[in-house]
Amino acid sequence: MSERKIAIAMSGGVDSSVAAGLLANRGQDVFGVMMRLWNPGQDNYNRCCSPADMSNAKTVAASLDIPFYVLDMQDEFKTHVVDSFVYGYAHGVTPNPCIQCNRIIRWDLLLKKVLAMGASHLATGHYARVTHNNDVYHLLRARDRLKDQSYVLSVLGQEELSKAIFPLGEMTKDQVRSHAREMELSVADRADSQDLCFVGNLDYRTFLEEFAPELPPPGPIMDVQGRQLGQHEGLANFTIGQRKGIGLTSEKPLYVISKDFETNVLTIGERHELGRDTFIVQNPNWIQGTPPSSDESVLVRVRYKSQEGEAFVVDSNHEHATIRLVEMLPDITPGQSAVFYTDDECLGGGIIAT
């Protein structure tokens, strides 16, 4: 029996369930925890952590013969994730709530809670890897590049990584499901969850109408030359690079080039007018404590599933970092995270400001 005690964050899905099973089957001292993030009366849209999710996680824990606890974190989630999501859209940016959830909810507040419960480590069902050498922890991409989630874990530092365990980091999704069937887990064939877990079956725009009725009003649609082409229904309905749903007819495809919260202007243009080669991230987090040198070429991803580009971090301090791309990227979007890599290693990231 291992001397360490591991809390496994469970969601009722196949990934966290298999992660729990792998740890339990290795003889680890494991207990399951699940965060209650929404009031059970608010599950009419199949939002995350519904009563059904709770029941699934509890059933899996019982089948693995591990203790299971539910932690009420509704207030924290509402304040730090949902309200932040709404605030971002209300102020003209496109936030990534998964980044915020991992930074504050899972790897700060939850980690502190399980440590207080006697755990030495926190495990999750994320697809990522951690290595340790010369007293330094490294966050690596998952072996399965298609499932890799190091992007949303770029907010972690040395302290968090020293206590993080990712049992699925070397596995493919097919292997995970195969393990779930071998373990006879009730969730073996459950569908994957969506990115915006708390939105559920709602379109995010409908969610915003429910939780943020005072979003920016309709305003002008302009081209890059400053000519007005029409009227938009509110900046929250658009994101950089968007093509569909702009509301204009044109012989050539049109894309969202920028959103100006101060003037409430939506600027659109053709694809060749989209993209930048320089941008700024705010409050960058460097996993090893220091940024790459200004002459070191790195890879940057500016959205979770976007293509990566070669870049240089030419200036960085605690408040911001300036990023210069070798070639322009088309989808640099304020509010999203820019995450940096060298080969398989995630160096860290920051929120795109401008």
Give short role names for the model-derived ranges.
Residues 1-154, 174-175:
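ATP-dependent adenylation/nucleotidyltransferase module used to activate substrates
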Residues 123-131, 135-354:
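AMP-forming adenylation/ATP pyrophosphatase catalytic core
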